Design a protein with these regions (language model features):
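Small cysteine-rich, disulfide-bonded extracellular modules of the LU/uPAR three-finger superfamily
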Residues: 1-104, 110-139
Length: 139
């Protein structure tokens, strides 16, 4: 089992269908937000990951800093244009205060009130376990 950093294949397809708009408050008439969920080293995530799942999602070793589903990725901004070969979206740092858990990677996914729901966007591999013990965990 491994977490392999990748843009999710399903995201590429859904992007071409017009199902992702990082800047708009709604997409296809439905409210949408992007979340970051964290996973243990037992998770298998990569390009073929299709959606958010609770399987091997992290849990708190103490306290309640982390909730299933993760946290909203706030204030997205899109960079790129005609003069550059790469475009990307950047979010504010996602921060868990008073955190006590270990994470090996994460999944950014779209959560909305209409279909498609919880579609994977990108898998983040941290390159190993990172642990917070009653401290701040920032991605």
């Amino acid at each position: 089992m491994a977490i392999t950093q990748a843009v999710a294949n399903v995201f590429k397809q859904e992007l071409l269908k017009g199902n992702h708009n990082f800047i708009g408050a709604t997409q296809n008439g439905t409210a949408a937000a992007y979340y970051l969920a964290l996973y243990t080293s037992s998770a298998t995530l990569g390009a073929t990951t299709t959606a958010y799942s609770t399987g091997n999602e992290i849990t708190n070793t103490a306290g309640t800093a982390y909730s299933a589903g993760g946290q909203v990725c706030g204030n997205p901004s899109v960079t790129g244009g005609a003069s550059v070969a790469t475009a990307y979206v950047d979010f504010d740092n996602v921060v868990w205060a008073s955190a006590s858990f270990t994470a090996n990677g994460g999944l950014i996914y779209r959560q909305d009130s209409g279909g498609p729901t919880n579609d994977a966007v990108v898998v983040l591999a941290f390159g190993g376990d990172f642990t917070a013990t009653n401290g701040t965990f920032t991605v």
